[in-house]
């Protein structure tokens, strides 16, 4: 956000709004302040967020803001487990019993592999190897595969065979409990 405001006459009047998909449904809004953002601009941004009926958090202007830093580490453990040889369905369903509204790969399908790859590459480049880039996600993007799940003829959600064919085939699978523990400790 700070880079985008460079050269503006009033960089103190710039904030970033980070919405979550689908915007009309997801209540969270991250408001990113730059080192130059003044309190009046932040207050205006908060009022806009209230008018939009959003729940706001103020974030430092940094790669990934708050949610993407947390989510990328969390999701990274799921994709790492899969890349190491854990079957996708075990990795994807390991957290069902702790109350998430959807599985990691259902979320991945909402966000899209291109966005997921961009976020992980950005965080890896700016924050280091703790934010690993999944070879599977890279292959999905390179081959144009857009979802982990598709709907069959009856409308039931099933694994996308094109995605399954591109998944890493490691030889060190984890159990569902191991996947859950590593994701929660990320």
PLM features per residue range, with description:
Residues 1-186:
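N-terminal glycine-rich phosphate-binding loop for ADP-containing cofactors
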């Amino acid at each position: 956000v700070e880079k985008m405001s460079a050269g503006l006459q009033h960089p103190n009047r710039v904030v970033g709004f980070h919405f979550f998909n689908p915007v009309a449904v997801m209540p969270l809004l991250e408001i990113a302040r730059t080192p130059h953002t003044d309190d009046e601009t932040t207050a205006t941004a908060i009022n806009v967020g209230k008018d939009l009926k959003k729940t706001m958090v103020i974030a430092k202007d940094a790669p990934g803001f708050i949610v993407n830093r947390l989510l990328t580490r969390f999701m990274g453990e799921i994709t790492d487990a899969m890349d190491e040889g854990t079957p996708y369905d075990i990795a994807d369903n390991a957290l069902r019993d702790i109350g998430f509204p959807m599985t990691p790969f259902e979320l991945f399908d909402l966000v899209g592999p291109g966005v997921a790859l961009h976020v992980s590459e950005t965080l890896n480049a700016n924050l280091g190897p703790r934010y690993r880039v999944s070879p599977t996600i890279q292959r999905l993007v390179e081959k144009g595969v857009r979802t982990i799940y598709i709907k069959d003829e009856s409308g039931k959600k099933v694994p996308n065979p094109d995605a399954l064919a591109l998944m890493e085939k490691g030889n060190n699978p984890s159990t569902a409990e191991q996947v859950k523990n590593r994701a929660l400790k990320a």
